[in-house]
Amino acid sequence: MIYRAILKRLRLEQLARVPAVSAASPFVMMAVGVFLMLMAGGVTISTTSQAFVTCGTVGLFLLLKGRKGRGVTCFLMMLSLLVSLRYMVWRLTTTLELHSPLQAALSLLLVAAELYALLTLCLSYFQMSWPLDRKPLPLPADTTDWPVVDVYVPSYNEELSLVRSTVLGALAIDWPADKLNVYILDDGRRKSFHAFAMEAGAGYIIRDQNNHAKAGNLNHALRVTEGEYVVIFDCDHIPTRGFLKKTIGWMMADPKLALLQTPHHFYSPDPFQRNLATGQNVPPEGNMFYGLVQDGNDFWDATFFCGSCAAIRRSAVLGIGGFATETVTEDAHTALKMQREGWHTAYLRQPLAAGLSTERLMLHIGQRVRWARGMLQIMRLDNPLLGSGLRWQQRLCYLSAMSHFLFAIPRLVFLASPLAFLFLGQNIIAASPFAILVYAFPHVFHSIGTLSRVEGRWRYSFWSEIYETTLALFLVRVTIMTLLNPRKGEFNVTDKGGLLQSEYFDLNAVYPNVILAVILALALVRGIGGMMWEYHDRLALQSFALNTLWVAVSLIIVLASIAVGRETRQIRHKPRVRATLPITLIDEHGQHYHAHTSDISLGGIAARLSTEHALPTQTRVTMLYHNEKDGIDVRIPAVILFSKPGQLHLQWSVDDLDVERQIVEFMFGRNDAWSNWGDFQPDRPVRSFLMVLRSIGGLFRRGQRLFRWQAPQEAPLAESEHVEEEKLEKKSLVLKPVRRSARHGATASLIVLLGLPAAIAPSLAQAPSRATPVATEQGATPVEPPPVNAPPPPSLPQPPGTLPTPPQIAPASAGELLPAATAVSLPTGPATQQMRERLSERTGVSPASPFGDTNTGALPADPSAPPIDPADAARVADGEITRTSTFRDLGLATGPLTLRGFSPLQGLDVIVPANRVVTRARITLSGALSPSLLPEASAVSVTLNEQYVGTIRVDPEHPRFGPITFDIDPLYFTGDNKLNFHFAGEYRRDCNDLYNEVLWARISDFSTVTLTTTRIAPDRKLSYLPAPFYDPNLRTPLRVPVVMPNPDAHGMLKASALVASWFGKLADFRKVSFPVSTTIPASGNAIAIGENLPIDARGTRPTGPTLSEVENPNDRLGTILVLTGRNAQEVEVAARVLAFSSDTLGAVGTKVVNDVTLQPRHPYDAPAFVPTDRPVRFGELVAASDLQGGGFAPPVMALPFHLPPDLYSWRNRPYPIDLWVRTPGGPVVDLETSRLDVHLNNNYLDSFTLKPPSLWAAWSERLVNQHAGAVEHAAALPPWLLFGQNQLKFSFDARPIDRGVCRRTPDDIHMSVDSDSWLDFRRGYHFARLPNLSYFAEAAFPFSRMADLSETTVVVPHHIDAGTAGTFMDLMGFFGATTWYPASGVQVADINDLSEHPPQGDILILATAGDAPKFEELLTRAPYELTDGHIRVGQHMGLQGIWYLFQDHDHAGLQDGVQANLNAPIAGAGVLLGAQSPYRSDRSVVALMGDTPSRMHDLVMGLRSKEDVPRIQGDLVLRNGDRLTSYRTAPTFTMGSLPWWMWLDWYLGTRPLTLYVLGLVGAGLVAAAAVRLLRRRAQHRLEEAARVKDTTDASH
C-alpha cells in the first residue's frame, strides 16, 4: 500500500501496525488526494500547456484501459473527474462573456447544462464505483421455519391472456404450499379474472373504490392478507420457480431488511432493439439500471423499489402507513419512506422473473414520462436531500435518480447550442477553437472512455444520448410543469402485449425530433457554406468548423432517435426466446426422438433433431422435459407445424389449465432461464458509434413507408364477436387461495365481502392507532367506523367442495373509509399463528410498533524638427533670439488639425519660457478648406488666448491656402498660451447639417509659429524655487547642470540623490538629466553641491547647512544654487530641506536651514502610485476640469495613473471601474446613437451609450445618489494592458437630435466624466517574478517599492568621475519621476566596504565596464560574466538549455543567452543586467554598466523613452546606439506574497508537468483510498446479514 511505503521511507513502519493509524490512513490518503486533485484541477494554464496535459492524460488512459481490476477502474474514474474539473473551472473562469442579454442567456444556459452533466457524471461514478454483486443466502434446512409469503399480481385493464402466465408462474414457485398465497388484485373487477382465479386456485381480491391506482390496490391487499412477506409481480412479470428461495433467505437473515429487489428482465425486445437496424446487438435500455446502478445502490444501502419482482417485509410497509400514494411512482417513494424509518434494502442481480417490453415507441415514451413525473414529484414533495433518516450515501443515490430525469432541458441545450453561432452569430464560449479543443476533448474523451469501461456490457457508448434525445422534447414540458405543480399527474397503466399488423413510421412519437433535425440540417448547410464561401480570418474559420462539427454530431444523434420511430411489424402473439434445452419428443406411435430447442415461446418451440429423419407435419407429439435441479418435469402435447430433416417447429396443444401451467413452467420456471441477460460484447466506443450510423441508415432502407400519427388499428371484430367484458359488482371481495393439495376436486374458496368496515383481521388488530388508512385521500380525516348492526348480506352460491365460508361482514356505506383496525377475518390456522410468533421473535416488532427510524521624461524631440543652431544655443547675451517651431514640434503629433461642423474648435499650446519675454511673433499657416463652402458665410478664425489674430477666407476655386502669415501682438503672450482655430462653415443658404461631409477645414501640422524673445534678469530669492531651474510650462526635456568640486567624495552622492530625485519629481514625464562638472559652467544656471562652498560673491564660507542663490560669475543672467555645509552631513541636510521644505525658505537669497523630520515610509506608498487598498476617485488623479469637454466631439480626456508593476490578480481578473458620465439635459443630443469610447494605453476597451436610466431610476437616484443625473457604466481594466505608467482616454462621440429643416442645433454643449468615478485595485496582490527589467524600466521596480528608496543600496566603485556621478543623478531623477518622492533613504556604498556591511535590501550597481570584475561577488547569481571587455554566459549555466525547455515562453522577443551563444563586446555599449541578490533570495540586483559614462547616461535616458521601454525585458539588455537586445537566461525568483491558494494556482499555472504529476498523484491517492474503503464496506454489507443470521440461529 502507498501509505505503508511512505511510512517505511520515513522509518515509521511501526505506525502501520497501530490499528488506529491503519484505520485512519485511507481517510488521510483521500484527504491529501482530494486536495491535490482540487489543486491540479482548479489551475488554468496556457492553451499550449493544456495541450501537453491533454496528451498526457489521454495517453495514460490508453495505456491503462486494457488492464483489469477495480483499482484501475477507480483510478480512471478519478482521472476522468480531474480532467472534467479542469474543463469546468476553465469554462467558468475564462470563457464567459455576457455582453448582451441574448449572449448572457445562451452562455449561462450552456454552462448550467454542463454543470448538470458533470454532477450527473460524479453521481454515476459514485453509484457504480463498487457493484455489490450479492449472492443468494441459503434458507434454514427446516421448512417449518420458512415464513408465509403473499404474492400479489395487481391488474387493472390488462388482457387476461397476459395475466394468466404470471399467475400460473407464481403458483409454480418452489415453496411450501401451505406458506404460499398468490392473489390477483383486480382493480378492473372482471368476471373472467374471477373465474380464472377460482380455476387456478389463486386468491382474488377486489375493492369497492379504485383510489390511488396501483398503490391503493396494494394497500388494500395488505389489509386483507397476513403473510409475513409480500412479493409483487406486475401482470406481465412471470417468475422462476426459485424466486422465493433466492430472495427470502436475505429477508430472514436480516430483520432490518425491508426490501429485496431483483431485476426487471424483458424477454421481448424494446422499441430500440426492434426498430433500429443494429438494435438486436445492443443491450436493452434497462440493463444498465438493473445490471449496474441498482447493484451499486445496494452497496450504499439505497436500493430502489421498482414496483415488481421484489420481496417486501409487511411490517416495514405497514410502519410507513402503506405504499406511498403521493406520487405516480409509488415504488421508489415507498422505498424512500422505509429507508427514512431506518429499514435496510437490498438487491440481487439475478433476473428471477421476465416480462414484456413496451411494443411501440409511443408507449415507451408515455411510460418514461410517468417515471420522470414521479421522480420529480418526489424531489418536490419529499426531497431525499432534506429531512431526517437517511445517510449521506443514500441521499446521493436518490439525488442521482431524481436528477437523471432532469436531462431533457440539458440534452436539448447540448443539441441546439451550435445554432447560436451558426444562426445568431453569438459566441457562447468565449475562447479560441484550439482552446476549446484542448479543454473539451479530454473531458469528453475520458467521460466516454471511463463510462465505457464501467458500463461495459450493460450500456454502449452514445446510446444514452439516443435514449435521452428520443424523450427530451416530450419531457421538457413535463419537467417544468411537475417542478411548478408537483401534485399534478395521474398513474397510467402501460399497455403490453399489443400487435402491429403492418410497418409504419410513427410521426406522433418523433415529430418534435423531425423538426429539430430539419433545423440542424439547415445549420449544417449554413456551417459548410460559411466555411467555403464566406471570408474570414483563421480564427473565424476554426469557429465555423468547430460549430459545424458540433451540429453534425447533434444531427447524427437526432437522426438515430428518429429512426426508432419506424415501427416494425409485430404479428406474433407470443414472443420467442432463444434457449437450448434438451427435450424428448414422443410421436403417436411411441417413438422417441432426442432434440434440442433453438427457441421457445408460449405458443410453441423450434427444435433441432439429433436425427436427419423428417417427421410429417400435423403430427401430434408429446414433448418431455425434465430438470431435476429446478424440480421441473413436464409433458406437453404439441402439433408439428413445420418439419425438415433435422429441424421442426411445434405448436402447443393447450387442452386444459394443467398444460398451460406446464408450458409456463417449462419456459419461465427454470432458475437459469434468464442468466444470459447480460451476454453482450463489451463496449467499444468506435464500434458503438458505427452501430449508431448503421441504425441511421436503417431509417432510409427500402420497405413500406407509411407515415401515421397513431398506430394502425387491427381489423375490427365482427358484430357478433363484440363481447363487452362482464364486471363484478363494485364491492370488496376476497377470494382465498386454494392450496395445491386441494386443487383437485375443488375450484376455490370464496369469501364474499359486501362491505369491510367491521371486519377485523388478526394481523391488523394490532395496527398502530396513529396510522392513517392507505385508502384515505391526502388531507382527508379518517372516518370512525359505524356500529356493526346491519343485517348480513345474502351469500353467493358456493361451488361444491369448497371450504367453509367465514362469517359475513356488514356492508359499509358508499365512500366510507377503511379504519386502521378493520380487515378481513381469515381462519386462524397453524401457519398464520406461526407467522405472527415468528414476526415478533425475529424482528422485535409487530404491526402495532413497526421498526423505527433515524476572496522629468517626455517624448523625445521629433527628428524631423529643424535643427537648432549650436551657436545660438550656446550664445548667452542680452540680445534677442528667434525660434521657429512647427505645429508638430509644439505637440501636434496626430496630423493636421481637422475642423468639422460638429467639432468646430481645435487648438494647441504655445509655451514661452518663464525667463523670457516675447518681443515679436507671427504664425504662418497652410492647409485646405472645403470647396463646397459658401465664401460669404464660411471662414476659420485664429485666436491666441482668446485674442483675435486673423481670419482664413474661403476660395472655392483654390481649396488649398497658404502659406498665410499673421503677426501677433507680443502683449497677448503669457507663459502657457492657447492658439485656437474656430471654424464656421455653411454649404447652403437656408439650413445646414453639421454632420455633412462637406463641412471641413484642415490646418497643416507643418504650419509654424515664430517667436522672438529676450531674457529677463532674474530675481534671486529662494522662495521662487524651483525657478529658474525648472519651468512647469515647458514640455521639453529638463537639463539641470550640477557642479561637484569633488565628485569622488561619496558623501556628496546622498545629497545629490535628494536634489536629483526632487527635480525628477517635478519634471514627472519629461526627461531630466544632470550633467556634472567640477567647475562653474560658462553660462546659464547650475546647482553647486559640496562642502564649504562660498555662499556669496565675497567667498563667505557656510556656518551650517546652507542654501544660497548667487550670480553665475561667467553669466550675469545666470544663477547658481549652492547647497553646502561644513561637512557631508550638513550638505545632506541642506539637500533634504530643499527637497521637502522649499516652500518655507522665504524671500531671501541665502539661508542656513534646519533639518526636517520625515515619517517612515511604508511599502507601495509612493505618491505616484494609485492606492491599492481602497477605491480611488478620478478627482484624486486629475482636476475635474480635465474630464470635461465642449461640443459634440470634445477633445480626448486623459486620466494618467501609475501602478506598481507587481500587481497580481487571481487568474488575471480585471480591475473594475465605476464610470459615471454626464451629458446635456433636454432634447439636444441623440443619446441612443451617441457613445463614449474608452481606451487604456492606446488599446480599445469598450464603448458605452449615453442613454440615461429610465425615468423611475433617474427619479429614485436623485433621492439617494450623489451621481444623480449621471449615467453609470461598469468597465474593467485587463491586467495584461496595465503597466507602471498608464493612461485612460475617454472619447465622446455625440450626435445632435434631428430637429428638422432649418432648425438650429446648439453647439455649446458640455459633457464630462464625473470626477467621483473610481478605479479599484483592491483585488490585486503584490507578487512578481524577477528579474524582470521591464518592471525596472516601467516603474523603477523593485526599488520603488519604498518611495524613499530606504531599502535600496547603490554600490559604486571606490573612485568615480564626474560622468559617473552625473549618471547617478540621472538615475535618481528617474526614481523621483517614478515615485514623486525624493530619495531620502537611499544608501550609497563603496564596493571596497561591501564585505563588512553586506546590504540586505535591493542593490543597484553603477560602474563602468572596466570596474566590472570588482562586482563579481554581487553578480554570483547572474548567468552572465563580464570579463575581457565582453559579456558572455557563465560556465555554470552550461545546462541552462535544459531549463529553457521547461520555462514559460510568453516573453515575446526575448532570446536565451545559452541558445544565442552570447559573447558580445561591451565597447560602445550599455549593459542593464538583473539578477537575484546573493544576500537574500527575495531581493534583486540591477547592474547598470557601460564602457564609458556617456553610454551609461544613454541607458538611463532610455528608461524615459516610450520607444525604448517596451524593448527592455528579461534579465539582460544590451544597448548599442539605438538598438536594444533583450535576453532571458536564468530562472526567475519571486518577490512578494500571495494567499496559499493563489500561490498554488500561480505555481502550477506555469508548470504543466508538475501540475500533471500532482494531478495523477492525487487521483492515485483517492483511488487507492477509495478501493480500500469500498472493499471494506462491501465485506461489511455482505457479512452483516450472515452475522445476524448466525446470532439468530444460536439463540434458537
From Swiss-Prot:
GO cellular component, one term: plasma membrane
Localization (cell): Cell inner membrane
Active site: D187, D331
Segments passing through the bilayer: 25-45, 106-126, 396-416, 421-441, 505-525, 544-564, 1553-1573
An annotated Gene Ontology molecular function: cyclic-di-GMP binding
Binding site for substrate: D234, D236
PANTHER family noted in UniProt: CELLULOSE SYNTHASE CATALYTIC SUBUNIT A [UDP-FORMING]
Protein name from the UniProt record: Cellulose synthase 2
Organism: Novacetimonas hansenii
